[in-house]
């Protein structure tokens, strides 16, 4: 794909999603099934408005079905699914097929006004998940439990492109007692899925077919943030009304090993702390416990809500400023300022009279979060815990113990 964007003066190539791959493979398979003509490329439209010309691989034409694949191309935003072959198998089967593990447009409530839905084409197209496509096992996702993890936009795209092929004369092609069965599969899917968020989201057995625009934007955090938010939504729909936010693995281990709390409450936020606390507020959580390494949360104490180093650092400056306000001597402040890592600074502080700085930072972190949530935060309890790399508790905000009690 030769579509480019410029970010910070650098040129990056766009890619296309697993949803676009599934759509292209489905359209190509249906075309070859109906016409019996072999093709090497296929055109599809994307919600982004960028048309794609996709190379069709691994073609298998038989008397009763056609299979083919499209290779996933993530452009310069390479993820776990990059270069995977996403397959579609098209076949015409009896309408009374007893296998109910399929999707149609009617599975998506928001499509009541969709043109494909109005045309009733959806009654004749059933999309299944095959080998390597995950199955949804938990509530809160955009697909019902027990269904294949094929998201709404790819499902719409598949139906739209097939309608472009068949038009509204599908009954004359399929007959009243037949339907078009599309099976999406990915032989590498089960292995690749282990490198994705799917296990945390309760999607088992393979990858998801995703993408809201059909196009992968390089250097974009949008997909990552959305995956994190989905876990928040999912836990809410499972009945949880309180949540523990941690940056990553270390936070999860701290919650499990040091606080002995159930990790069912834990959601990882990565560096997107501001985004995720806003999402927690939007979804309706009223009790939020935050636990993180001092190197991350010291930034939040100064109002930095994306903790990636490319966005902001200032860890030494924040620490020096708070120690100075406590009356620390210049020589000590200078040693802190020369530390390369916060862990190095922690070692100095732990052997000093200024250990209270950790609680001060925790309280400032809490107040910054409350300010970030604006006036709507009065009914939300937020408390903060800061720990070191060896999972030792360093500090906590004033009412942390009371909030921890509600998670026990």
UniProtKB/Swiss-Prot annotation:
This is Cobalt-precorrin-5B C(1)-methyltransferase. One of its GO terms (molecular function) is cobalt-precorrin-5B C1-methyltransferase activity. It comes from Clostridioides difficile (strain 630). Keywords: Cobalamin biosynthesis, Methyltransferase, S-adenosyl-L-methionine, Transferase. Pfam families: CbiD. Signal peptide: none annotated. Pathway: Cofactor biosynthesis; adenosylcobalamin biosynthesis; cob(II)yrinate a,c-diamide from sirohydrochlorin (anaerobic route): step 6/10. InterPro entries: CbiD, CbiD_sf. Belongs to the CbiD family. The lineage of its organism: Bacteria, Bacillati, Bacillota, Clostridia, Peptostreptococcales. Its EC number is 2.1.1.195. GO terms for biological process: anaerobic cobalamin biosynthetic process; methylation. It catalyses: Co-precorrin-5B + S-adenosyl-L-methionine = Co-precorrin-6A + S-adenosyl-L-homocysteine. SUPFAM superfamilies: CbiD-like.
């Amino acid at each position: 794909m030769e579509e480019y964007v410029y970010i910070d003066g650098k040129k990056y190539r766009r890619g296309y999603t697993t949803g676009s791959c599934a759509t292209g493979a489905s359209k190509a398979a249906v075309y070859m099934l109906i016409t019996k003509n072999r093709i090497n490329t296929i055109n599809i439209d994307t919600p982004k408005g960028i048309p794609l010309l996709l190379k069709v691989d691994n073609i298998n034409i038989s008397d009763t079905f056609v299979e083919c694949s499209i290779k996933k191309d993530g452009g310069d935003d390479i993820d776990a699914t990059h270069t995977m072959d996403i397959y579609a198998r098209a076949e015409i089967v009896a309408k009374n097929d007893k296998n109910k593990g399929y999707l149609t447009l009617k599975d998506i409530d928001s499509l009541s006004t969709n043109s494909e839905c109005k045309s009733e084409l959806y009654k004749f197209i059933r999309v299944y998940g095959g080998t390597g496509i995950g199955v949804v096992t938990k509530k809160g996702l955009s697909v019902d439990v027990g269904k294949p993890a094929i998201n709404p936009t790819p499902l719409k795209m598949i139906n739209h492109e097939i309608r472009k092929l068949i038009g509204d004369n599908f009954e004359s092609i399929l007959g009243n007692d037949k339907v078009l069965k599309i099976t999406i599969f990915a032989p590498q899917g089960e292995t690749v899925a282990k490198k994705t968020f799917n296990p945390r989201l309760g999607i088992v057995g393979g990858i998801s077919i995703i993408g809201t625009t059909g196009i992968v934007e390089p250097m974009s955090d949008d997909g990552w943030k959305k995956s994190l938010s989905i876990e928040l939504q999912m836990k809410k729909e499972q009945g949880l009304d309180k949540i523990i936010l941690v940056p990553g693995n270390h936070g999860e281990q701290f919650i499990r090993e040091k606080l002995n709390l159930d990790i069912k409450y834990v959601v990882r936020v990565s560096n997107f702390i501001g985004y995720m606390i806003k999402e927690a507020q939007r979804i309706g959580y009223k009790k939020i416990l935050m636990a993180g390494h001092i190197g991350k949360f010291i930034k939040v104490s100064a109002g930095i809500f994306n903790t990636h180093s490319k966005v902001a650092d200032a860890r030494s400056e924040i620490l020096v400023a708070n120690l100075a306000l406590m009356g620390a001597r210049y020589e000590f402040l200078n040693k802190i300022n020369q530390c390369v890592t916060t862990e190095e600074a922690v070692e100095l502080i732990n052997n000093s009279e200024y250990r209270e700085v950790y609680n001060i930072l925790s309280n400032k972190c809490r107040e910054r979060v409350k300010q970030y949530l604006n006036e709507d935060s009065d009914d939300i309890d937020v408390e903060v815990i800061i720990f070191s790399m060896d999972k030792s508790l360093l500090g906590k905000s004033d009412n942390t113990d009371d909030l921890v009690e509600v998670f026990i």
